Design a protein with these regions (language model features):
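His-Asp phosphorelay/catalytic-motif detector in bacterial-type signaling
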Residues: 45-47, 70-75, 187
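Active-site residues of response regulator receiver
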Residues: 8, 52, 79
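Basic, amphipathic DNA-recognition helix from helix-turn-helix-like DNA-binding domains
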Residues: 59-61, 65-69, 74-131, 202
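Short, Lys/Arg-enriched segments at the junction into DNA-binding effector domains
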Residues: 2-3, 114-171, 175, 209, ...
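Active-site beta3 strand of CheY-like receiver
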Residues: 44-50, 55
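Short hydrophobic/Thr-rich beta-strand motif most characteristic of the beta2 strand and flanking loop
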Residues: 6, 25-32, 36, 40
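Charged docking surfaces used in two-component/phosphorelay signaling
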Residues: 12-23
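Hydrophobic residue at a beta-alpha junction
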Residues: 31-32, 40, 55-58, 85
Length: 229
């Protein structure tokens, strides 16, 4: 049974989320502020965190940043419609996804299921390692190496890079990446792809001065992994 930490300071949202999560056979933990969320996350090591941005003590952005420095636990951010900059920042610092309030509980449950599946199985369709020039990905071990240096990737980042590697040299549209990596009909914009690519390039940069030459932006279309890099 997966354990999910729900972090929100609104009792009505806490009650609705815990009811629906437990109805779907998840174990739930609750925190009403950012400080308490960090304490519980460190002690209980949950499988997923649903994290509101607007929190007392520490806001969700700060909590997400701290958690991402300490672990790769999947994080779904809850945001208000007028918090676009916070949504982008949350994705850039490592949140796996976001849901805008007021949200459909059915939509959120679908995302929870998908994010957990990705985290637990890495969402890859082959256990065979892939090598594209100086990049090697081993899905069975969840290991990635670039220029013979190990990369520390979250499940989402690994899936994204693996998907691009399986289609090396081919342009993947943002919609195709959403479908194959995120794994559901996405209700928001395609910005999650762009911010995930940005994070991925940041980690590739640790092994290369020019990560953008490996994951290439095809303006107006999407991205591709350069098979000649």
């Amino acid at each position: 049974m997966a354990t999910i930490l729900v972090v929100d300071d609104e009792p009505a949202i806490i009650d609705a989320l815990t009811y629906n999560l437990e109805k779907n056979l998840y174990r739930t933990l609750v925190a009403l502020d950012g400080e308490r969320a960090l304490e519980i996350a460190r002690r209980e090591n949950p499988d997923l965190i649903i994290l509101d941005i607007m929190l007392p003590a520490r806001d969700g952005i700060e909590v997400c940043r701290i958690l991402r420095q300490e672990s790769d636990v999947p994080i779904i951010m809850l945001t208000a419609r007028d918090e676009e900059l916070d949504r982008v920042l949350g994705l850039e610092i490592g949140a796996d996804d976001y849901v805008v309030k007021p949200f459909s509980m059915r939509e959120l449950m679908a995302r929870v299921k998908t994010v957990l599946r990705r985290s637990q199985t890495m969402s890859v369709q082959s256990d065979k390692p892939i090598t594209v020039e100086k990049l090697t990905l081993d899905p069975g071990r969840h290991e990635a190496r670039y220029h013979d240096e190990a990369l520390s990737l979250s499940a989402l980042e690994f899936d994204l890079l693996f998907c691009l590697a399986r289609h090396a040299g081919q342009v993947m549209t943002r919609e195709q990446l959403l479908d194959q990596v995120w794994g559901y009909d996405y209700f928001g914009d395609t910005r999650v792809v762009d911010t995930a690519i940005k994070r991925l390039r940041g980690k590739l940069k640790q092994s290369s001065d020019h990560p953008e030459t490996l994951v290439i932006t095809v303006r107006g279309v999407g991205y591709k992994l350069d098979s000649k890099n």
